[in-house]
Amino acid sequence: MSACKGENFTYSNFHCNLYIDNSTHHDPTLASAMNAMSPGVFCTIKYLPNRNAYFFTSNQGQSSTNNFDAKDTERGNSSRIGMNNGLIVGYANLSNDGSGYHFYAFDAQCPVCFDYNAIPMRSYPLSINGSGIATCANCKRQFNLNTGGNCINNTGQMTTYRATTAGPFGILFIN
């Protein structure tokens, strides 16, 4: 069954289609995670509905708020930030295969506890420490973002999305 292997089965079938142009936002928190020269820095992206703005926090202690511009509003980016208002992006520091570090985009909800189809939908956000370990407060699972989001104290795998970046102050696209 070699047809069932490969990268087609490592990504979520939920499509965010999030597009952020950091050349217009100039957000330093997001830029730090989009920099290939700083692997191990991850940025959580959230939407603040009361401000119509992005809220960025990094696992290195940075945080910033950046208002939507007209293009963000036009694209409907407020509804494209993960399954429940949260994405984590960054270069993994243990993924260098000789061609550079791998850029990842993860959903910010625990893949074990969160159910997109549950009524009512309950949030199980992951918290990230400075080493790039994401922890669920509910099930206590820990996921290593630097190795692709594998669970390090149980079973499971982070929900990942296809993502590209054009550098710190370029375009971030998460599919």
Q: Predicted segments — roles?
A:
Residues M1-K5:
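Sec-dependent bacterial lipoprotein signal peptides
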Residues F9-P125, N144, T160-N175:
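N-terminal pre-ligand scaffold of iron-sulfur
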Residues A105, S131-A134, L145-N146:
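Disulfide-bonded cysteine motifs in exported proteins
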Residues P125-C139, N150-T165:
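Short cysteine/histidine-rich metal-coordination sites, predominantly Zn2+-binding motifs
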